[in-house]
Amino acid sequence: MKEPGPNFVTVRKGLHSFKMAFVKHLLLFLSPRLECSGSITDHCSLHLPVQEILMSQPPEQLGLQTNLGNQESSGMMKLFMPRPKVLAQYESIQFMP
């Protein structure tokens, strides 16, 4: 007598679990990571997956607005990246030169 194979519900649940785990790991990979030293300091560096692209080209070529007015005094450059059009707000990211 032939062994019955896995039923459709079991296979479907397993596939759903695999998809959810894959999406979770993908989101964790793409999410920004905040790296700090062990002590409490006033400086942390934000590492984004697209940081190499942003730093390799001038912001004007990428369509980003820069605020260079206070760069000499603060030693930082601010980039304003538009969020999706649904929110219509701006997100500020600072890079140390």
UniProtKB/Swiss-Prot annotation:
Which branch of life, at top level?
A: Eukaryota
Organs and tissues of expression: Expressed in numerous tissues; not found in breast, heart, small intestine and liver. Isoform 1: Predominantly expressed in the testis. Isoform 3: Predominantly expressed in the testis, at lower level in the placenta, during malignant progression of melanocytic tumors and in several tumors of varying origins. Isoform 4: Predominantly expressed in the testis, at lower level in the placenta, during malignant progression of melanocytic tumors and in several tumors of varying origins. Isoform 5: Predominantly expressed in the testis. Isoform 6: Predominantly expressed in the testis.
Mention any additional remark: Potential cancer-testis antigen, with expression restricted to the testis and certain malignant cells.
What protein name applies here?
Down syndrome critical region protein 8
Q: Write the lineage as a comma-separated list.
A: Eukaryota, Metazoa, Chordata, Craniata, Vertebrata
